[in-house]
Design a protein with these regions (language model features):
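Short, basic (Lys/Arg/His-rich) helix/loop patches that form interaction surfaces
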Residues: 41, 45, 96-106, 116, ...
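C-terminal catalytic core of Y-nucleophile DNA break-rejoin enzymes
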Residues: 139-141, 148-165, 172-195, 206-228
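Short, polar N-cap/turn motifs at the start of nucleic acid-interacting alpha helices
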Residues: 130-139, 237-239
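Basic, Lys/Arg- and aromatic-enriched nucleic-acid-binding interface segment
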Residues: 45-51, 64, 68-126, 133-137, ...
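N-terminal core-binding DNA-recognition domain of tyrosine site-specific recombinases/integrases
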Residues: 1-67, 83, 216-222, 235-244
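Short, solvent-exposed alpha-helical surface patches in well-structured domains
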Residues: 4, 32, 50, 75, ...
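Charged catalytic carboxylate motif
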Residues: 8, 29, 50-54, 93, ...
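Conserved hydrophobic/aromatic pocket- or pore-lining residues that grip, position, or stack substrates
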Residues: 13, 30, 55-58, 66, ...
């Protein structure tokens, strides 16, 4: 997301090599940035790799805009990322967590996460317009996501980027890539629960399925707190994520 790109630039790129002119960047500067992220900030190789990819993309855009003639990152080498296996709930653990959830909003959230693979922003930004029918089957046509953006991040978005304020610091944006826009057929039991939930709670003014009692959008921070409570409820530690 654009918010993530801006954050990476501010936290990892500028402090390390922000004083260097674009047309003077060399492979040594990229290595300096990698050392800054990993040695001085104590971050992982994955974070260093994210900074490198973000800068590479920014420089590629600078070439297209005619700001510089070539992308100096082409001669550099991306940091080697040490692969770390993510902890994942077993199907039995996921079923127990869902069954133990006492709030119908979050029970449905966890069901969507585990049964469809929908990402956090896609679930938080789910709208009535994304619900379609294919014969008797209900389909979610993922076209939007909801993400938290600061005023500065919104002002820094390139022209043409679709970004609609939803309230509570949340904005409706398109998925990062075309692959993110996809159709997800729902199992009948999940479809029935989703439609029943909408019947009980209705949409907010922006058509969001998930919102609080006052129609305010839910945020990733709220989900994270509820997720940890759900893990605690079934005796699991916090190493697991709702996308596992």
């Amino acid at each position: 997301t654009w918010g993530t790109y801006a954050s990476v630039i501010e936290r990892n790129v500028k402090p390390a090599i922000g004083a260097v002119r674009l047309d003077e960047l060399k492979p040594a500067h990229f290595r300096r940035m990698e050392r800054y992220v990993m040695d001085e900030q104590g971050k992982s190789s994955g974070t260093a790799g994210s900074a490198w990819r973000t800068l590479h993309k920014a420089l590629e855009d600078a070439v297209l805009e005619g700001v510089i003639e070539r992308n100096p990152a082409v001669k550099g080498t991306a940091p080697r990322v040490a692969l770390k296996e993510r902890a994942a709930l077993t199907p039995e653990q996921a079923a127990d967590l869902i069954a133990a959830e006492t709030d119908d909003t979050w029970r449905l959230m966890w069901m969507l996460a585990f049964m469809t693979g929908m990402r956090q922003g896609e679930r938080l930004g789910l709208t009535e317009d994304e619900l379609r029918r294919d014969g008797d089957r209900l389909i979610i046509l993922v076209e939007w996501q909801a993400q938290h953006l600061t005023k500065r991040e919104v002002e820094g978005l390139p022209k043409g980027v679709e970004c609609t304020p939803l309230g509570n610091g949340m904005y409706r944006t398109r998925p990062k890539t075309e692959k993110g826009r996809r159709a997800i057929p729902l199992p009948q039991a999940l479809a029935d629960q989703l439609l029943a939930y909408i019947e009980r709670h209705g949409m907010n003014k922006d058509g969001l399925v998930f919102h609080d009692d006052e129609g305010i959008p839910l945020t990733g921070c709220v989900e994270r707190r509820r997720w940890y409570r759900a893990l605690d409820r079934v005796g699991l530690n916090h190493e697991y994520g709702p996308h596992s």
